Amino acid sequence: MKLTCVVIVVVLFLTACQLITADDSRRTQKHRALRSTTKLSLSTRCRIPNQKCFQHLDDCCSRKCNRFNKCV
């Protein structure tokens, strides 16, 4: 019984902490439109033009690999 009460109190405390910090973080994200595109390009490495590429991997930043296996 004691353990159940402690678990309930801890869960309520952690929930309250999350709600308090969620209020502080509202409207702090800048450049919202850029987030999805820059996040993808920063999280994956891509090859710049004239670097060696592989057509079946799509590893060029432009997603275009020519027949000489160079990024366009």
From Swiss-Prot:
<keyword id="KW-0632">Potassium channel impairing toxin</keyword>
<keyword id="KW-0732">Signal</keyword>
<dbReference type="Pfam" id="PF02950">
    <property type="entry name" value="Conotoxin"/>
</dbReference>
<comment type="function">
    <text>Kappa-conotoxins bind and inhibit voltage-gated potassium channels (Kv). This toxin inhibits the drosophila Shaker channel (IC(50)=57-80 nM). In vivo, when tested in fish, this toxin induces hyperactivity, followed by continuous contraction and extension of major fins, without immobilization or death. Injection of this peptide together with the delta-conotoxin PVIA causes the sudden tetanus of prey (STOP) syndrome, which is a single, lethal 'fin-pop' in envenomed fish. When tested in mice, induces hyperactivity.</text>
</comment>
<dbReference type="GO" id="GO:0008200">
    <property type="term" value="F:ion channel inhibitor activity"/>
</dbReference>
<dbReference type="GO" id="GO:0090729">
    <property type="term" value="F:toxin activity"/>
</dbReference>
<keyword id="KW-1220">Voltage-gated potassium channel impairing toxin</keyword>
<dbReference type="InterPro" id="IPR004214">
    <property type="entry name" value="Conotoxin"/>
</dbReference>
<dbReference type="GO" id="GO:0015459">
    <property type="term" value="F:potassium channel regulator activity"/>
</dbReference>
<feature type="signal peptide">
    <location>
        <begin position="1"/>
        <end position="22"/>
    </location>
</feature>
<feature type="modified residue" description="4-hydroxyproline">
    <location>
        <position position="49"/>
    </location>
</feature>
<feature type="disulfide bond">
    <location>
        <begin position="53"/>
        <end position="65"/>
    </location>
</feature>
<dbReference type="GO" id="GO:0005576">
    <property type="term" value="C:extracellular region"/>
</dbReference>
<comment type="similarity">
    <text>Belongs to the conotoxin O1 superfamily.</text>
</comment>
<feature type="site" description="Inserts into the pore of the channel and blocks the flow of potassium ions">
    <location>
        <position position="52"/>
    </location>
</feature>
<keyword id="KW-0379">Hydroxylation</keyword>
<keyword id="KW-0800">Toxin</keyword>
<keyword id="KW-1015">Disulfide bond</keyword>
<keyword id="KW-0528">Neurotoxin</keyword>
<feature type="propeptide">
    <location>
        <begin position="23"/>
        <end position="45"/>
    </location>
</feature>
<keyword id="KW-0964">Secreted</keyword>
<keyword id="KW-0960">Knottin</keyword>
<feature type="disulfide bond">
    <location>
        <begin position="46"/>
        <end position="61"/>
    </location>
</feature>
<protein>
    <recommendedName>
        <fullName>Kappa-conotoxin PVIIA</fullName>
    </recommendedName>
</protein>
<keyword id="KW-0872">Ion channel impairing toxin</keyword>
<keyword id="KW-0582">Pharmaceutical</keyword>
<feature type="disulfide bond">
    <location>
        <begin position="60"/>
        <end position="71"/>
    </location>
</feature>
